[in-house]
Amino acid sequence: MTSTSNLIEQVIEAWQNMQAKTPLVQCITNSVAANYTANVLLASGASPAMIDNPYEAESFTKISSALSINLGTPTSEQMQAMQISAKTAQLNNVPWVLDPVGYGPILAWRSQMTDELLQFKPSVIRGNASEISTLAGNQVQSKGVDSTLSSDQAYQQAFSLLTHASCIAISGESDYILSNEVDAVIQVNGGSPLQPKITATGCALGALIAAYSAVTTPTIAALSAHIHFAIAGKLAANQAQTMGSFSSIFMDYIHMLDANLIEQYADIKLLNKQA
């Protein structure tokens, strides 16, 4: 039977393993998020590589510890790289994370491409409530790439996506993790209302899940990354109330996280699965 204490122990072990191994994470991400994502990975103990050229994608994915694919600003060439890298990851047992930014009928081309990427079986699908709910086949009104649905509503609509991935991670006021590996839904609390106001925090979270997936199971990877962000957000908010100072202190705590902080501040709850 899964317990919160056992899960937190596994998160601490995953964090320790990432510090020891410095996993190489290939990021095919959007132009808005690339710099911030790379800095978050470096601060967390991983090694980012923003390789999104289709002519280099296959060879680089083969040597990567993990792959992160984010559809925030896809171009035709970048989409080719995504398809090549996702296929290569599946064939070479490289864990990979799919972040279906903006999925829905308004952005139809990227949504079609996202559907095609699902055939390569991502380890984790990560998104906001609207993206995940729409990807699961529900009709949801979104505001651009921002969610208009609460995460506690979305997780109850997302179980069908577990046919495509081992784990589904939904970010929001509380975060929810659905998994084929755990007999409960995991709710992660913490963070700050300022986090969504900083460009690319969600995108960087997806890449951090990929980094953790190089050293642990998909479920613990998603949980570790969400706890990592939740603790950093909570502690940063205790020191800063404005966006500029919060952003800087948040990155500091991304870097300063350790086993003691995880044990002290990780706030998770187990919920019954309601398919």
From Swiss-Prot:
Segments passing through the bilayer: none
Enzyme class: transferase
InterPro entries named in the record: Hyethyz_kinase (IPR000417), Ribokinase-like (IPR029056)
Keyword line: ATP-binding, Kinase, Magnesium, Metal-binding, Nucleotide-binding, Thiamine biosynthesis, Transferase
GO terms assigned for molecular function: ATP binding; hydroxyethylthiazole kinase activity; magnesium ion binding
HAMAP family: Thz_kinase (MF_00228)
Protein name as it appears in the record: Hydroxyethylthiazole kinase
